[in-house]
Amino acid sequence: MGSKIGFILVIIIIAASFLGTISVAKILYNPSIEDYTVQAQKIFDQAKQKVEQIRNTSLPITNLHVITKAEAVAMWGSPSGSQDLTNIYRQEKIYKGLFLMPENESLYQANQDWTANWGAATVGNDIYVIKENFDPFRMPDAEATFVHELTHVWQPDLQWPATYDQDKAHTALVEGDASYMGDVFMNIAKSQSVPEASVDNVPTYLLGTQLSANVHPMLNTLWDLNYFPYDQGKTFVKTLYEHGGFATINQAYMRGYTPDTTEQIIYPDKYFANETAQPVPAPTLAENNWQLAQTDRGQNHNTYGEHFINIMLANWLNKNTAQQASTGWGGDNFTYYERGSDFLFTWNIKWDTSCDASEFYIAFFNMMNATGAIGDGSCLWTAYGRHIYIDWNQNLNTTLVAVSTVQSAVQPTYFT
């Protein structure tokens, strides 16, 4: 799994497969750490040969490590410093401001829960298996997990993503490729397909089992945001393969061919047509005493993309309405400001047509009413000490969403 604190891809790929390779046999047998490690190393070596054969490549020397769930959370599920913690708290305010998280939930805790679900992880040329979550005696699922992880070892480094949406697109290529390789291995092994578990058609060796009940449950919205690269990414990579085999997949790692938006992942025809995000400006504020906060990627603004919009709307509306209202996304500019203990963020979204802009405007209006926020009857709402505003510029086919702890900062006259 390609992930970082705050759910982003890092330059040194951290890749993981989810809890799901634990079997009843392991629970009853409970092998010693020595037997466990010997078995894991055995199928690890077998999987390495399989990846080299399937991809017609040679993998570098790769080391296998056995760690505990607590060690995994300490390594990848906690902030790396004060700035990282600040970014997590800002992101939590964004999620809550857009009603993606209830007020009593913690994004810090969600990060740890996400890591606690991992079964294996890859960092550079080192692969880690989490003993509580991974059963090397369950075949062929366990070997398929190593095929997934070893694919990450092979994958070339991608250009550093500048935005949230670009990061999700890059991660979809990385995780989609690794998940597709796991499927290729399973087909070669001629194993019986495992019935659908809990997330679309992803094999259970990448999903939680009944043991995941011991893990603090993640919010559906956060799970859907972060599972997108595995689910939709595999479908995207399968489409690449159908257009030219592994050569087309390999080409996608080259600069100029790497997917840049979640829209391209959802609609591969837009990838092949090289339809990228349109540049969108941030609105000018009426006051200049707000401090611009850079993103965790060092940028002055972010882009959240079509998939994020879809998940936000689907949290309150039916899935078909959310999908239809997010289709037609053309680009967006998300800018975050602070002033003392107050915050303001603006989200200027460009749409392909006036109809697309209208559909989102209506869907967002209905979403806000569904949240129980107190509205003024037009385009302003208040909830939990935050004020939310939406505007539709029919001349530019844009919609502006603004959220702030300061009511005067979300008035229509505040933005130009």
What name fits each language-model region?
Residues 1-31, 51, 416:
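Secretory targeting signatures
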Residues 145, 149-153, 157:
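Catalytic glutamate of the conserved HExxH
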Residues 73-87, 104-128, 136-137:
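Catalytic zinc-binding patch centered on the HExxH motif and its immediate surroundings
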Residues 154-210:
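Post-HExxH zinc-binding segment in Zn-dependent metallohydrolases
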Residues 217-341, 348:
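Pan-zinc metallopeptidase signature
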Residues 127-146, 165-170:
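Short pre-active-site segment immediately N-terminal to the catalytic Zn-binding motif
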Residues 60-80, 165, 170, 197-205:
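Acidic helix-start/capping segments at beta-turn-to-alpha-helix junctions
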Residues 341-416:
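C-terminal soluble interaction/assembly domains
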